[in-house]
């Protein structure tokens, strides 16, 4: 698979690699996400890391596998979809996210994500 910003983001998220995610994200990121319970926003890398690792995939959530990553161009945007296997004290789950993003200066400057939630396999 050819590397893309979106697929690199998905791999770094699966590894919970905040250093790599910070390299991929523009300092002026415009991020919005939608989960099954609410909408989320971040406007800088610190807010985004807090959202990703304190709210979406907390310490108790171990990403044990990457089931799928696919990306494609949608006109001037990239679309990336990824599915993770996640384990936590409540059991084993699949989590899928679909994201659209734009790039500036080689980094993600705009991103919209929709999440399936933690679903039983």
Please annotate each region the language model reported.
Residues 1-28:
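Short, low-complexity N-terminal intrinsically disordered segments enriched in polar/charged residues
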Residues 12, 32, 86-87:
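Alpha-helix C-capping/helix-to-loop hinge sites
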Residues 50-121:
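A beta-strand edge to alpha-helix "cap/lid" segment located at domain peripheries
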Residues 18-20, 26-73:
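A solvent-exposed, acidic/Ser-Thr-rich amphipathic alpha-helical stretch
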Residues 3-13, 36-39, 53-57, 110:
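Short, mixed-charge, low-aromatic patches
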Residues 1, 5, 48, 93:
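Soluble or luminal CAZymes and related metallo-dependent hydrolases
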